[in-house]
């Protein structure tokens, strides 16, 4: 029995994305696991049940997120011996990550931390911290500077 069969890799489309994908890819290769690239977009303000504004069933954000995930996969996964899929969700970030992990029965969650401290951490909080505290699954948190420049 393999330790990891399904790995969830949550990305934000920022400078941390290549590092997170790198770590997730290498673990997936080592264990022959399937990798799921996920981007969670915050719910739009008009998504509440009290809104009189109808929601597009396939909103622009999802198309944009999928296109960005496909670019990330092309740059860091294709031709690297890893089976992967792409998913998007619209939710609060930690909720979206945990929901996807549960839905796919992920064996591992990989995500980045930005190392916020002080007032910024107090006001914004940490998605990584919320995922770690609430997840029944192992979570690997990557600091972007942990991957040497040029290693993809």
Where are these regions (language model features)?
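Structural beta-alpha unit
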Residues: 1-2, 74-109, 146-152
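General small-molecule cofactor/ligand-binding pocket signal
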Residues: 38, 85-89, 140
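Short, hinge-like loop/turn segments at secondary-structure boundaries
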Residues: 52-56, 103-104, 127-128
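Glycine-rich, Arg-bearing micro-motifs that act as flexible, cationic patches
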Residues: 108-130, 148-149
């Amino acid at each position: 029995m393999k330790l990891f069969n399904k790995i969830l890799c949550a990305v934000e489309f920022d400078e941390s994305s290549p590092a997170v994908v790198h770590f997730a890819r290498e673990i997936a290769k080592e264990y022959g696991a399937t990798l799921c690239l996920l981007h969670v977009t915050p719910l739009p303000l008009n998504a509440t049940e009290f809104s009189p504004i109808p929601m597009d069933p396939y909103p622009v954000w999802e198309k944009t997120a999928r296109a960005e995930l496909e670019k990330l996969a092309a740059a860091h996964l294709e031709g690297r011996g890893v089976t992967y899929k792409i998913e998007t969700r619209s939710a609060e970030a930690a909720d979206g990550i945990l929901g996807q992990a549960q839905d796919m029965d992920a064996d591992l969650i990989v995500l980045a931390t930005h190392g916020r401290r002080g007032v910024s951490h107090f006001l914004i909080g940490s998605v990584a911290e919320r995922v770690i505290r609430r997840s029944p699954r192992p979570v690997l948190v990557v600091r972007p500077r942990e991957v040497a420049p040029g290693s993809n």
